[in-house]
């Protein structure tokens, strides 16, 4: 297995690799965190601790599927750590004693300035390397905490200042995606002394309704609630927020820990290319186990070698220059689909989708059960390629629109 140096320095702390557990059930106690370290994770954000002790519901999870796939989206109704504060602090102490070279980040959540300041002091005394301020849990809003705080720049700035009074450790502010402009809150966190941003937390959601009982899922004694949604389905949302943060002139160099739908090395590379420097994972671990880090580290190592990068740092943020406003995109040409008839299985998916959801440009030969593109009707949307189950449709002939001057293209 190829292994390159995947170490990265983030907010002044050196991580052996960028892969971390996010604050969640996967890092809830000493035993779980020790196993994660032994498996190869570079850092752990211990499940959020506070003076509030959670009393969890049962059941507390739901998921969303697509056809015959595993779940693509995951709903959880968990709150912060259910163990007493001293028990959590003892776990942090023991982890740092047993794994001094691994990074341990303490996630904290308070109800007021005094609690934020005291929690920061306590986790620094316990040996944590960094602090993550959880301003974004959707399940904690009724306790004057969680994502409601993360929607208020004033509260975020105030609580960041309180944490800085209690500790000298590097501090991250964890952002909620349940907001229109994350940059405004990130700037408030920066003013308050935050050293970086962690984003995104889960998206407020209702995943499913039991059609017979007319109750949201999961059902807790005949009721349900809105709560956090995670997994592969939220990755595009996370990438969008990270790109917007990175392109803000006052946040360009502000460190970001990326979270949201990371399961593979390709996912990891996408977050890095948009500007995240460390990566946090929960739902992928819940679905596949801690050992996914082995494939992610190996795949990322091969990618660095193939691309000629000497270090992980060299690739961070490289894709941002190619994300531009929609009105600035080149609209001078059409790309027609190219169909590999040898790979085509004659399922007709492209024909149906084009006829019912496109521009009726895909024609169907019933005798040979093969599709053909009518370029007189085709607008080059490439819907056909996206629905093809065997990937036999890709980019083909390019035609410049009437009156447009031909020029070099990157497709």
From Swiss-Prot:
<keyword id="KW-0677">Repeat</keyword>
<dbReference type="InterPro" id="IPR017896">
    <property type="entry name" value="4Fe4S_Fe-S-bd"/>
</dbReference>
<dbReference type="GO" id="GO:0051539">
    <property type="term" value="F:4 iron, 4 sulfur cluster binding"/>
</dbReference>
<feature type="binding site">
    <location>
        <position position="347"/>
    </location>
    <ligand>
        <name>[4Fe-4S] cluster 1</name>
    </ligand>
</feature>
<feature type="binding site">
    <location>
        <position position="76"/>
    </location>
    <ligand>
        <name>substrate</name>
    </ligand>
</feature>
<feature type="binding site">
    <location>
        <position position="344"/>
    </location>
    <ligand>
        <name>[4Fe-4S] cluster 1</name>
    </ligand>
</feature>
<keyword id="KW-0560">Oxidoreductase</keyword>
<dbReference type="InterPro" id="IPR013785">
    <property type="entry name" value="Aldolase_TIM"/>
</dbReference>
<feature type="binding site">
    <location>
        <position position="388"/>
    </location>
    <ligand>
        <name>[4Fe-4S] cluster 1</name>
    </ligand>
</feature>
<keyword id="KW-0520">NAD</keyword>
<feature type="binding site">
    <location>
        <position position="381"/>
    </location>
    <ligand>
        <name>[4Fe-4S] cluster 2</name>
    </ligand>
</feature>
<dbReference type="GO" id="GO:0004159">
    <property type="term" value="F:dihydropyrimidine dehydrogenase (NAD+) activity"/>
</dbReference>
<comment type="similarity">
    <text>Belongs to the dihydropyrimidine dehydrogenase family.</text>
</comment>
<feature type="domain" description="4Fe-4S ferredoxin-type 2">
    <location>
        <begin position="369"/>
        <end position="398"/>
    </location>
</feature>
<keyword id="KW-0411">Iron-sulfur</keyword>
<dbReference type="Pfam" id="PF01180">
    <property type="entry name" value="DHO_dh"/>
</dbReference>
<feature type="domain" description="4Fe-4S ferredoxin-type 1">
    <location>
        <begin position="335"/>
        <end position="367"/>
    </location>
</feature>
<dbReference type="GO" id="GO:0003954">
    <property type="term" value="F:NADH dehydrogenase activity"/>
</dbReference>
<dbReference type="InterPro" id="IPR017900">
    <property type="entry name" value="4Fe4S_Fe_S_CS"/>
</dbReference>
<feature type="binding site">
    <location>
        <position position="378"/>
    </location>
    <ligand>
        <name>[4Fe-4S] cluster 2</name>
    </ligand>
</feature>
<feature type="binding site">
    <location>
        <position position="384"/>
    </location>
    <ligand>
        <name>[4Fe-4S] cluster 2</name>
    </ligand>
</feature>
<comment type="subunit">
    <text>Heterotetramer of 2 PreA and 2 PreT subunits.</text>
</comment>
<keyword id="KW-0408">Iron</keyword>
<dbReference type="InterPro" id="IPR005720">
    <property type="entry name" value="Dihydroorotate_DH_cat"/>
</dbReference>
<feature type="binding site">
    <location>
        <begin position="134"/>
        <end position="136"/>
    </location>
    <ligand>
        <name>substrate</name>
    </ligand>
</feature>
<feature type="binding site">
    <location>
        <position position="350"/>
    </location>
    <ligand>
        <name>[4Fe-4S] cluster 1</name>
    </ligand>
</feature>
<dbReference type="Pfam" id="PF14697">
    <property type="entry name" value="Fer4_21"/>
</dbReference>
<feature type="active site" description="Nucleophile">
    <location>
        <position position="137"/>
    </location>
</feature>
<feature type="binding site">
    <location>
        <begin position="201"/>
        <end position="202"/>
    </location>
    <ligand>
        <name>substrate</name>
    </ligand>
</feature>
<keyword id="KW-0004">4Fe-4S</keyword>
<keyword id="KW-0479">Metal-binding</keyword>
<dbReference type="GO" id="GO:0046872">
    <property type="term" value="F:metal ion binding"/>
</dbReference>
<dbReference type="GO" id="GO:0006208">
    <property type="term" value="P:pyrimidine nucleobase catabolic process"/>
</dbReference>
<protein>
    <recommendedName>
        <fullName>NAD-dependent dihydropyrimidine dehydrogenase subunit PreA</fullName>
        <ecNumber>1.3.1.1</ecNumber>
    </recommendedName>
</protein>
<comment type="function">
    <text>Involved in pyrimidine base degradation. Catalyzes physiologically the reduction of uracil to 5,6-dihydrouracil (DHU) by using NADH as a specific cosubstrate. It also catalyzes the reverse reaction and the reduction of thymine to 5,6-dihydrothymine (DHT).</text>
</comment>
<feature type="binding site">
    <location>
        <position position="354"/>
    </location>
    <ligand>
        <name>[4Fe-4S] cluster 2</name>
    </ligand>
</feature>
<dbReference type="GO" id="GO:0005737">
    <property type="term" value="C:cytoplasm"/>
</dbReference>
